[in-house]
């Protein structure tokens, strides 16, 4: 029983460390670009060893991919909230583009130039954009259909 608890604790600790690394990397990448930020800088900034960093992330591209996944999760949460309150699809699209523009303004342009050198990351970004927009639009359509059905039901 003790072994199982210690295994769970290790997994939890690793997960927490990984999350801290991803958040720190996201901040550094956004401020300075990807190329300028070295794995050494991230490890030193978090007071962890490079070994720990490389045990969790094979290379900088893996770390960058996790940063992009975090951003996608945040965007999905935002779009879900927007879609649930929006009156029409145009409002959803407008909010999406406003948020994207805000993210763009808060990110060093070098970041966008640098990520083009990471093919896995670029594929992930393209897929994410399509899925985020599709899910937001579908969420709004579903909401609209439910409203129509409710009105029809209330009529009877």
What are the residue ranges of the model-derived segments?
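Hydrophobic alpha-helical connector segments
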Residues: 66, 77-106
């Amino acid at each position: 029983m003790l072994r199982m608890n210690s295994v769970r604790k290790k997994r939890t600790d690793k997960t927490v460390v990984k999350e801290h690394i991803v958040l720190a990397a996201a901040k550094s990448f956004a401020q300075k670009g990807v190329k300028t930020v070295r794995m050494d800088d991230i490890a030193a900034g978090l007071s962890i060893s490079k070994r720990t960093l490389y045990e969790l992330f094979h290379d900088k591209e893996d770390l960058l991919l996790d940063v992009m996944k975090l951003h996608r999760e945040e965007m999905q949460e935002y779009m879900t909230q927007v879609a649930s309150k929006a009156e029409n699809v145009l409002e959803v699209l407008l909010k999406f583009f406003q948020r994207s523009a805000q993210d763009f303004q808060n990110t060093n342009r070098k970041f966008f130039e640098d990520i083009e050198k990471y093919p896995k990351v670029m594929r992930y970004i393209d897929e994410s954009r399509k899925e985020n927009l599709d899910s937001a639009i579908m969420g709004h359509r579903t909401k609209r259909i439910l409203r129509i059905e409710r009105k029809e039901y209330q009529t009877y």
